[in-house]
């Protein structure tokens, strides 16, 4: 069974824009010629899923952790998919992302930010520095991340905001009855 879940299936309303109105505001590039036609073709050939207020990444995270699907491979070159504990093919290699590795990736992205998605993390901290901080953690990852934010002059609210912007939702972050996200709290 094949499914097509693509950014253009992202809902018009995005819950992250309620957390930070500048989220993804840096994206102004137009889609390539023929993109809409390709998208319409995909909608006729594959099962396509859209969920209210969510990006395609979140839909993948929720479906992949819901228990409804087994023996699948998530195919995407997007590094954000590494927050999802499942089998992944990133167009270079296939690997299994454990829950522990997925959690680590979330906190790494919280520290380093993601300029493509438009959230900053801690200014001056990139992937390598974020990994160094996490590899020397004391307590939980959240404790370590919170300390790093405070050490750089930020408040707890800043750290939580970055974490919620970074977090790819899993099934336990989705209110199925009300069809809305449950904001992640560490």
Give each language-model segment a name:
Residues 1-5:
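Short, small-residue-biased leader/transition segments that mark boundaries at the very start
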Residues 25-186:
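Extended two-metal-dependent nuclease catalytic cores across DNA- and RNA-processing enzymes
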Residues 22:
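Contiguous, small/hydrophobic- and glycine-enriched helical/loop subdomains that border
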Residues 7-13, 18-19:
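Short loop/turn segments at strand-loop or loop-helix junctions that form parts
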């Amino acid at each position: 069974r094949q499914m097509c879940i693509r950014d253009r299936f992202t809902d018009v309303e995005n819950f992250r824009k309620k957390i930070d109105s500048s989220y993804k505001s840096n994206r102004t590039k137009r889609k390539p010629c023929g993109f809409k036609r390709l998208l319409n073709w995909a909608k006729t050939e594959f099962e396509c899923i859209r969920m209210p207020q969510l990006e395609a990444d979140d839909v993948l995270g929720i479906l992949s952790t819901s228990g409804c699907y087994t023996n699948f491979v998530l195919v995407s070159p997007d590094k954000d998919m590494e927050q999802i504990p499942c089998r992944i093919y990133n167009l270079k290699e296939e690997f299994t992302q454990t829950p522990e590795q997925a959690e680590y990736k979330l906190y790494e992205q919280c520290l380093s930010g993601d300029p493509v998605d438009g959230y900053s993390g801690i200014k001056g901290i990139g992937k390598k520095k974020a990994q160094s901080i996490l590899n020397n953690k004391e307590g939980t990852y959240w404790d370590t991340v919170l300390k790093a934010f405070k050490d750089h002059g930020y408040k707890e609210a800043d750290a939580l905001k970055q974490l919620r912007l970074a977090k790819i939702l899993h099934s336990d972050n989705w209110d199925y009855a009300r069809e809305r996200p449950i904001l992640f709290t560490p």
